[in-house]
Curated annotation (Swiss-Prot):
The protein's name: Imidazole glycerol phosphate synthase subunit HisH
Keywords: Amino-acid biosynthesis, Cytoplasm, Glutamine amidotransferase, Histidine biosynthesis, Hydrolase, Lyase
Subunit structure: Heterodimer of HisH and HisF.
A Gene Ontology molecular function term of the record: lyase activity
CDD domains: GATase1_IGP_Synthase (cd01748)
Originating organism: Methanocaldococcus jannaschii (strain ATCC 43067 / DSM 2661 / JAL-1 / JCM 10045 / NBRC 100440) (Methanococcus jannaschii)
Glutamine amidotransferase type-1 domain mapped to chain residues: 1-196
Principal location listed in the UniProt entry: cytoplasm
Pathway assigned in UniProt: Amino-acid biosynthesis; L-histidine biosynthesis; L-histidine from 5-phospho-alpha-D-ribose 1-diphosphate: step 5/9
Gene Ontology cellular component annotations, sorted alphabetically: cytoplasm
Keyword flag Cell division: no
Residues forming the catalytic site: 76 (nucleophile), 177, 179
EC code: 4.3.2.10, 3.5.1.2
Location in the cell: Cytoplasm
Amino acid sequence: MIGIIDYNAGNLRSIQKAVELYDKVIITNNSEELLACDKIILPGVGNFGSAMENLAPLKETIYKIVDDRVPFLGICLGMQILFEESEEKRGIKGLGIIKGNVIKFKDVEKLPHMGWNSVKIVKDCPLFEGIKNNSYFYFVHSYHVNPDEDCIVGKTEYGREFPSVINKDNVFATQFHPEKSGKIGLKIIENFVELL
C-alpha cells in the first residue's frame, strides 16, 4: 500500500491515479494509516509556509517514517519542504530531512518555470532505471532546492543549472511532476513503487 500524505496542498487526485496503475493507494492525514504503508509520497502545490503549517501535526510521523527507512518520495513543493528553510517564507522551518535551503530563481525571463524541460542524470538512482538521460519532464515552480552536492541525482537548466532530483538513503524527491509527465513520468512512479 502506498500512502499519499494529505495536507491540503492540492494535486492529490492526479498522483493517486498514476500510482493506482501499479499499487493500492490511500490518501490520508492519519498517522496510524501512514505508518502502516509500504511507501509514502509527499506531493505538493502551493506555498512553503502554509504547507509547513498544515503538516505540523504530521511532522513526527514523517520523521518516524524516514527513520524507519520506508521509501519516501517528495514531489515539487513536497521536495522543497524536505529542506531546512525557504526564501519563500523566511522564518518558517522546513522538515530539515535534507540539509540545504530553497531559493528563488534569479535573473530569469519568466516565473514560474513552467513546462517541459530535460533532466541530466548525474548519479545512478533507482528512480531512473530504464529512463534515458536528458529525458523531458513537466515543471511548475519559482523556487529550487540548494542541497549538498552528494544527494543530487539530476540537474535541469533554467537560467542556471539547478538540482531537480535528489536522493538520500530512502528519501527521493523530484522538482518536476512525474504524474504530469506522460509515460516517462509514470516510469518514475513505477520505479518508486517497485523499490524494495
